[in-house]
């Protein structure tokens, strides 16, 4: 494995040196607004706001056309603010708020094409695909001191479509900031168990991302 790693570095390093003017690297962070869909119960969950952090690389094919890839760590949440009926110690039904939250931690790899436009090519749209790998998931509830590990209830792989819109703020010849709104639309059923009413569980994540890009 180490030999393969060094072979890849040996091959790629000269290419990076030759094409360094066409390649931008970056670090990014932001917020995601995540929700689930595919069945009535999942769609009743309230979307959750959480965070993402990652790194990026962008290769320019032309001045206004490029291919980008990110590797992001994404924390996704969905909340159940419904009511649960329980039987108390005297045998009477009582209603409490569930206040539970599903938490998913993913590594997400989006690959997409950017098209720049405007007088200074400072606006852009993009589209492509993403691949997600589930690190872990859990169910957290205010009514319990312990979280429930739900990792085994979900498939490890998620994948879907990516599309977004953004603005470039040029800092100098080698550095810029990009502010982007991006949609990750999951297309796979992520549940590893049968879903209520023969449904599915699919992810949806709307991202607000700030990316610092630089040339080496």
Task: Name each region found by the language model.
Residues 40-44, 98-102, 150-155, 195-199:
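Outer-membrane beta-barrel domain signature
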Residues 23, 31, 58-142, 169-173, ...:
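Gram-negative (and chloroplast) outer-membrane scaffold detector with strong preference
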Residues 112, 148-150, 164:
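Short structured motifs
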Residues 1-28, 210-216:
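Bacterial Sec-dependent N-terminal signal peptides
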Residues 21-23, 45-51, 103-107, 155-161, ...:
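Residues that define the transmembrane beta-barrel architecture of outer-membrane proteins
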Residues 37-43, 79-86, 137-146, 190-196:
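Outer-membrane beta-barrel translocator domains and adjoining extracellular loop/strand segments
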Residues 20-57, 213-215:
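Short glycine/proline- and aromatic-enriched beta-strand/turn motifs that initiate or cap beta-hairpins
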Residues 70, 76-82, 152-216:
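Predominantly the C-terminal beta-signal and adjacent terminal strand-loop region
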């Amino acid at each position: 494995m180490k030999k393969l790693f060094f072979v890849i570095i040996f091959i790629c390093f000269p290419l990076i040196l030759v094409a360094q003017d066409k390649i931008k690297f970056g670090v990014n962070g932001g917020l995601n607004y995540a929700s689930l869909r595919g069945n009535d119960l999942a769609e009743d969950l309230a979307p959750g706001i959480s965070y993402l952090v990652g790194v990026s690389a962008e290769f320019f094919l032309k001045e206004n056309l490029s291919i980008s890839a990110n590797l992001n760590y994404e924390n996704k949440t969905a909340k159940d603010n419904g009511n649960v009926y329980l039987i108390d110690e005297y045998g009477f039904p009582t209603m409490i708020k569930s206040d539970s939250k599903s938490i998913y931690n993913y590594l997400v790899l989006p690959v997409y094409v950017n098209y720049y436009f405007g007088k200074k090519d400072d606006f852009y749209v993009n589209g492509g695909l993403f691949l997600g790998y589930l690190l872990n998931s859990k169910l957290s509830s205010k009514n319990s001191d312990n979280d429930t590990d739900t990792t085994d209830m979900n498939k490890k792989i998620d994948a879907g479509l990516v599309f977004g819109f953004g603005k470039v703020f040029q800092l100098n010849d080698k550095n810029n900031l990009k502010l982007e709104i991006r949609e990750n639309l999951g297309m796979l059923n992520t549940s590893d168990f049968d879903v209520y009413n023969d449904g599915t569980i699919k992810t949806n994540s709307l991202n607000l991302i700030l990316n610092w890009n630089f040339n080496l």
